[in-house]
């Protein structure tokens, strides 16, 4: 393309931005990407949700003379984009299975005659032989592959139909390709470039940081009640609640509705018209909350979602990041709340182990472990996210639960040096479990076979628990001093940032591992204050006695959450007891008296213990 022509197109980009899309200035990175595409060079764009990825191909589509084809995985995503473009006066259309044959022919005629500038299409439809023949005659000027991480088995949402897109480079060797994603680590990025056959692409990686989103975690205790209270505290704000099964989606939505909250279920098992109705009502603010499986949201461009809840832990950080990214797209404060129970992680791990052995299972295991490390982090959660994506930062954000309510710190320089030195001494070839065994001086054949029992660092940390050293190494990963090489069975490897700590040139504050105190502290925090642990123990003992007499499990009497609240509020009258979550009239009548008597005796200090 001639230089003068490129310059003319580049100046036109600002005009299209202002006149067609109504924005006065480009966001960081957008202009360079657009200029690169207009010059005919391939691009890989990694930009957070709400960061303006779509404009990177929509503006060139309006400046280049011809058809731009956009590969998109979901009908809802296509429809949303096309509706927005048409509202801006752009000749855009999509081809999908919900259209009649007449509608599809009309779209194809528009592509052939040049009336349509942007065509959205699913990968499986695009790759049909007869469609590729049509496309060749239409002389496309740009191919944009949205959600490009779907092409990579290293990605968090691999889709086999995306893998076939690699054949397009042979069919269209000179056509500029653009791949776009919000979530791709370095391995996934390399995979996208290789599998799509991108030629010397510009790789534009924007910051993954969404500073307006507050990342929070609540340990599950009585999850539905915790969720109800959380939603009620939102006071009518718009939100999405993600669950990992259709049944839980239905149950949770019904529970919210029973509390008078405007909520609806959304999952792939519902009829198309029901899903479309829910999506439309949510988009129009006629519905406060959508309770959904992960099928919901990829096509959502609702700017005023104020909170996203993960009622179950996702299988990987990429999914978590993408789904939480649907909050606060207007840049105003928003919150991402993760409900966490280590048992959920154990269940996901069991499910994973039932899958066929192989590289794909290894990838999924690595990603699941990273998600678990995020949930159990004792350092700034935003740092965990950003360092996972390779965006090295060491300054805590001040806007997550860890920063707002920090765990106790200690001078971890010596522990860090032991861990970092051990990683280096075993040649950065081994995973966390093995490194911890060396640190603690484990006496096993594998360590002896490698001669690692002869290392100076062997056994230097035997005075501390396995959990302690796992916590230390996880924190070093979160702080960007250590990485896990997914391609080498999650081997621990040192970064440049580790050098000054290893040399003793800088000290390092680490969080005291909350191995024992974590659960009680999380529960105490969830229920809004301190509770009397001695009284709690007595209440549990009484509950066990009553449950045994009644031949029911203890939780049928009162669950632990209710007992903690009793130990916090110390109710000694019927009205006070009824104010405790989990105590209704029937349970008050049946079990109330002995519990109130025990609490009264404890308060008066004249109980037996």
Curated annotation (Swiss-Prot):
Effect of residue 555 to A: HRDC fragment binds ssDNA very poorly, whole protein no longer binds 3'-overhang DNA but binds Holliday junctions better, whole protein has full helicase activity with 3'-overhang substrate
Catalytic activity: Couples ATP hydrolysis with the unwinding of duplex DNA by translocating in the 3'-5' direction; ATP + H2O = ADP + phosphate + H(+)
Alphabetized UniProt keyword annotations: ATP-binding, DNA damage, DNA recombination, DNA repair, DNA-binding, Helicase, Hydrolase, Isomerase, Manganese, Metal-binding, Nucleotide-binding, SOS response, Zinc
NCBIfam families: PRK11057.1 (NF008279), recQ (TIGR01389), recQ_fam (TIGR00614)
Keyword Metal-binding: yes
Notes on how activity is controlled: Helicase activity on dsDNA is inhibited by ATP-gamma-S. Helicase activity on dsDNA is inhibited by porphyrin derivative meso-tetra (N-methyl-4-pyridyl) porphine tetra tosylate (T4) at 20 uM but not inhibited by N-methyl mesoporphyrin IX (NMM). Helicase activity on G-quadruplex DNA is inhibited by porphyrin derivatives T4 (2 uM) and NMM (0.2 uM) but not by ATP-gamma-S.
Consequence of substituting residue 544 to A: Nearly 10-fold decrease in ssDNA binding by HRDC fragment
Protein's name in the database: ATP-dependent DNA helicase RecQ
Activity relative to temperature: Optimum temperature is 50 degrees Celsius, able to efficiently unwind Holliday junction DNA at 55 degrees Celsius.
Source species, domain of life: Bacteria
BP GO terms, sorted: DNA damage response; DNA recombination; DNA repair; DNA replication; SOS response
UniProt enzyme class: isomerase
Induction details: By mitomycin C and UV irradiation under the regulation of the SOS system.
SMART domains (UniProt xref): DEXDc, HELICc, HRDC, RQC
Domain HRDC: 529-609
Annotated binding of Zn(2+), by residue: 380, 397, 400, 403
EC number, as in UniProt: 5.6.2.4
Cofactor: Mg(2+); Zn(2+)
Domain Helicase ATP-binding: 34-202
Entry GO terms, CC: bacterial nucleoid; chromosome; cytoplasm; replisome; single-stranded DNA-dependent ATP-dependent DNA helicase complex
Residues the entry annotates as binding ATP: 23, 27, 30, 50-54
Keyword Nucleotidyltransferase: no
UniProt GO molecular function: 3'-5' DNA helicase activity; ATP binding; ATP hydrolysis activity; ATP-dependent activity, acting on DNA; catalytic activity, acting on a nucleic acid; DNA binding; DNA helicase activity; four-way junction helicase activity
Domain remarks: Limited proteoloysis experiments show there is a large N-terminal domain with ATPase/helicase functions and a non-essential C-terminal domain (HRDC). The N-terminal 21 residues are required for helicase and ATPase activity, the C-terminal HRDC domain is required for stable DNA-binding but not ATPase or helicase activity. Has 5 structural subdomains; the first 2 (residues 1-208 and 209-340) are the conserved helicase domains which abut and form a deep cleft that probably binds ATP and ssDNA.
Function noted in UniProt: An ATP-dependent DNA helicase which unwinds DNA in a 3'-5' direction. ATPase activity is stimulated by single-stranded (ss)DNA but only very poorly by double-stranded (ds)DNA. Binds to and unwinds a wide variety of substrates including 3- and 4-way junctions (including Holliday junctions, HJ), flayed duplexes, 5'- and 3'-overhangs and blunt end duplexes. HJ DNA unwinding is stimulated by single-stranded binding protein (SSB). Unwinds G-quadruplex DNA. Unlike yeast SGS1 or human BLM, is equally active on dsDNA versus G-quadruplex substrates.
């Amino acid at each position: 393309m001639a230089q003068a022509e490129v310059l003319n197109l580049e100046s036109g980009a600002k005009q299209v931005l202002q006149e067609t899309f109504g924005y006065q200035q480009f966001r960081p990175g957008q202009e360079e990407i657009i200029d690169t595409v207009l010059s005919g060079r391939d691009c890989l764009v990694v930009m957070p949700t709400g960061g303006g990825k779509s404009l990177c191909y929509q503006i060139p589509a309006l400046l280049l003379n011809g058809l731009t084809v956009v590969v998109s995985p979901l009908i809802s995503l296509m429809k949303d984009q096309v509706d927005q473009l048409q509202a801006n006066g752009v000749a855009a259309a999509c081809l999908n299975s919900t259209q009649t044959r007449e509608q599809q022919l009309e779209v194809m005629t528009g592509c052939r005659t040049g009336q349509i500038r942007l065509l959205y299409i699913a990968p499986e439809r695009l790759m049909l032989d007869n469609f590729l023949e049509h496309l060749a005659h239409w002389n496309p000027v740009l191919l944009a592959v949205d959600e490009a991480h779907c092409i990579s088995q290293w990605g968090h949402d691999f889709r086999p139909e995306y893998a076939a897109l690699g054949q397009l480079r042979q069919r269209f060797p000179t056509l500029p390709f653009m791949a776009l994603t919000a979530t791709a680590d370095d391995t996934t990025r390399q995979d996208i470039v290789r599998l799509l056959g991108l030629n010397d692409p510009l790789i534009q990686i924007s910051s993954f940081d969404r500073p307006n989103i507050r990342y929070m975690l609540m340990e599950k205790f009585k999850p539905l009640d915790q969720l109800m209270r959380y939603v009620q505290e939102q006071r009518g704000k718009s939100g999405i609640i993600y669950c990992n099964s259709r049944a839980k989606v239905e149950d949770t939505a019904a529970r919210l509705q029973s509390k008078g909250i405007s909520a609806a279920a959304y999952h792939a098992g519902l009829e198309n018209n029901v899903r479309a109705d829910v999506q439309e009502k949510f988009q129009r603010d006629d519905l406060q909350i959508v309770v959904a499986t992960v099928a919901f949201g990829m096509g959502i461009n609702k700017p005023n979602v104020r909170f996203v809840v993960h009622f179950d832990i996702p299988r990987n950080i990429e999914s978590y990041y993408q789904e939480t990214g649907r909050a606060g797209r207007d840049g105003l404060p928003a919150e991402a709340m993760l409900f966490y129970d280590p048992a959920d992680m154990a269940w996901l791990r069991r499910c994973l182990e039932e899958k066929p052995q192989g590289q794909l299972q290894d990838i999924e295991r690595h990603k699941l472990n990273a998600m678990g490390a995020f949930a159990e982090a004792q350092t700034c959660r935003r740092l965990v996210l950003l360092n996972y994506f390779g965006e090295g930062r060491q300054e805590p954000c001040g806007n997550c639960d860890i920063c707002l309510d920090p765990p106790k710190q200690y001078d971890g320089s010596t522990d860090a040096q032991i861990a970092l030195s051990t990683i280096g001494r075993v040649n950065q070839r081994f995973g966390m479990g093995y490194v911890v065994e060396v640190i603690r001086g484990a006496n096993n054949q594998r360590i002896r076979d490698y001669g690692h029992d002869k290392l100076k660092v062997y056994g230097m940390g035997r005075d501390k628990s396995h959990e302690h050293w796992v916590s230390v190494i996880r924190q070093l990963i979160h702080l960007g001093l250590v990485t896990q090489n997914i391609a080498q069975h999650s081997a621990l490897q040192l970064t440049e940032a580790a050098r000054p700590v290893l040399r003793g040139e800088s000290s390092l504050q680490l969080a005291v591992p909350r191995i024992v105190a974590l659960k009680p502290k999380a529960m105490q925090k969830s229920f809004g204050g301190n509770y009397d642990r001695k009284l709690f123990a007595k209440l549990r003992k009484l509950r066990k006695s009553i449950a045994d007499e009644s031949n029911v499990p203890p939780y049928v009497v009162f669950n632990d959450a209710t007992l903690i609240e009793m130990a916090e509020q110390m109710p000694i009258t019927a009205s006070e007891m009824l104010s405790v979550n989990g105590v209704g009239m029937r349970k008050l009548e049946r079990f109330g008296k002995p519990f109130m008597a025990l609490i009264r005796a404890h308060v008066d200090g004249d109980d037996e213990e």
